[in-house]
Amino acid sequence: MFNRVFTRSFASSLRAAASKAAAPPPVRLFGVEGTYATALYQAAAKNSSIDAAFQSLQKVESTVKKNPKLGHLLLNPALSLKDRNSVIDAIVETHKNLDGYVVNLLKVLSENNRLGCFEKIASDFGVLNDAHNGLLKGTVTSAEPLDPKSFKRIEKALSASKLVGQGKSLKLENVVKPEIKGGLIVELGDKTVDLSISTKIQKLNKVLEDSI
């Protein structure tokens, strides 16, 4: 049986995040999953248990990935509340030392039939945890793979820019998307700089359409 006091406590942290009453997270996240991840981060931060929450999320995520049947159950929106609670009980029983805030998160997701959001929430929390530890992950999207020299030059320039910030380490990844046609799209945390040719074409088309 879930402890509803703890569940309501975690739900309160969600409302605090939504009202921006709590301390701001190191990176802004969006969407339902981002809201849950931010609420978990802020709740854990109050008790200096961010790392414990991150480790617990990884344990649950690993358990789900190793058990396809369990993963299927989590993604099944038709599952009854009783069955969802049973799934959570099984996960908690497997990891008896899970962080309390993560357990409460699972309970809230179960009650709101949003267990299917867990994987993205865990991923979003990872972004917050990295930023908390001074590591900023980013992507530079190009139409073709960047050669090592160009990639290093871009990485060096971004590391020294205000987009990264002083005292932070940048971990950059090159993502290839031929559909952008050319140019670059840089994404660092919650910031995006779109210098792709496809976007420039879209803007030009809009100007032409508006002028007709």
UniProtKB/Swiss-Prot annotation:
Sorted alphabetically, the keyword list is: ATP synthesis, Hydrogen ion transport, Ion transport, Membrane, Mitochondrion, Mitochondrion inner membrane, Transit peptide, Transport
Q: Does the keyword field hold Mitochondrion? A: yes
Query: Which residues lie in coiled coils?
Result: none
Q: Name one GO cellular component term.
A: mitochondrion
Give a GO molecular function annotation for the protein: proton-transporting ATP synthase activity, rotational mechanism
Recorded hits in InterPro entries, A to Z, give: ATP_synth_OSCP/delta_N_sf (IPR026015), ATPase_OSCP/d_CS (IPR020781), ATPase_OSCP/dsu (IPR000711)
A Pfam family reported for this protein in Swiss-Prot or TrEMBL: OSCP
Read off the Gene3D superfamilies from this record: N-terminal domain of the delta subunit of the F1F0-ATP synthase (1.10.520.20)
Judging by the UniProt lineage, the source's domain of life is: Eukaryota
- Transit peptide feature range: 1-17
Where in or outside the cell it occurs: the entry states: Mitochondrion; Mitochondrion inner membrane
> Where the protein is mainly located, per its record?
mitochondrion
Q: Which GO terms describe its biological process?
A: proton motive force-driven ATP synthesis; proton motive force-driven mitochondrial ATP synthesis
Assembly mode: F-type ATPases have 2 components, CF(1) - the catalytic core - and CF(0) - the membrane proton channel. CF(1) has five subunits: alpha(3), beta(3), gamma(1), delta(1), epsilon(1). CF(0) has three main subunits: a, b and c.
Protein function: Mitochondrial membrane ATP synthase (F(1)F(0) ATP synthase or Complex V) produces ATP from ADP in the presence of a proton gradient across the membrane which is generated by electron transport complexes of the respiratory chain. F-type ATPases consist of two structural domains, F(1) - containing the extramembraneous catalytic core and F(0) - containing the membrane proton channel, linked together by a central stalk and a peripheral stalk. During catalysis, ATP synthesis in the catalytic domain of F(1) is coupled via a rotary mechanism of the central stalk subunits to proton translocation.
What other comment is given for this protein?
Answer: Present with 32400 molecules/cell in log phase SD medium.
Q: Which PANTHER family match?
A: ATP SYNTHASE DELTA CHAIN (PTHR11910)
Q: What is this protein called?
A: ATP synthase subunit 5, mitochondrial
- The scientific name of the source species is Saccharomyces cerevisiae (strain ATCC 204508 / S288c) (Baker's yeast)
